[in-house]
Amino acid sequence: MGEIGKLTINGKVFEHVKTRAYAPVSIFKSGDLFLRKGPKKLLEEEIAFHRTLLEYDFPIPRILEEGDLEGEYYYIETSLGEKHFGEIFIEDTKNHGGISKNHFGNFLEVAEKFAKAQLATRNERRNEESFYSGLGLEFNIEELPELKEDTLRAFDKVKEKSKSLPYVLTHGDFNPYNILERGVIDFGSSFHAPAGYDIVTNIYHIYNFPEKDGYEMKRCFDFSEQQKETYLEKMNVIYREAGLPEPTDFADDFIFCRTIWATVRNEKIPKIQKWRYDRFGKILAAYLRDESLPELVEKEWGK
């Protein structure tokens, strides 16, 4: 119990940080501890999933405590760092004009641990229903019905091209804003997808934000070409050693899929929504024409 916006448990005061956009779960912080509070069934499922991730050695927080609270359920977990890499990279860019070598190295180290743990979940069963649902393809078709035929044709192309890849447990929103100095947070968007989807889109997701002012959000940092090359080659090595095709061979497919995901359910940010609708149409057409999407997004939406 406690003041509005605060909870006190075992003498520790937790202050409200945020409430998830698409789930009735509130997040509180006390020092280096985080508390999540919400419906019991939802959080018990989340805790069980969290423990599964730990079994696969994903770099994620440890759960210290759980229980009933004010008619709901809660659990407390350790912190993985004070700032996510989105914040760190923005500060680097403001202060030094780009992402620092040391911070990029830390980011890469966590991403490598994640990639290796994720491959331990590989499954030859292709759960295409989970992939379809996880990307929000149904929402995309509802919001952009005039593009339905081309969108479904493009998704069929993705499925065909990625047949050589096993499916893995996928974060769904793997990007610098969900990666901290000691691990990864917020698996709330997880689903099953072809191996490499998270890995490639991690460094291309920033292009789903406009660089200019006048929007609810904007892109405030970018990776250098050398950093992109270093990151992608590290990931390619991990996949080669696992006997799998290189993720970069599927960059077009994964960037297109991440664009589907980023385009939907943006009602609360209408300026970004319109910008992403226009952008999706361009990327969809380019993907169906077999154009290079890494080159396109960097040319059209990069610096």
Model-derived segments and their meaning:
Residues 71-84:
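Conserved short submotifs of the Hanks-type protein kinase catalytic core
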Residues 62-73:
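Short beta-strand micro-motifs within the conserved protein kinase catalytic domain, predominantly
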Residues 2, 122-172:
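An alpha-helical support segment within catalytic cores of ATP-dependent transferases
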Residues 83-130, 152, 158-162:
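Conserved kinase catalytic-core helix
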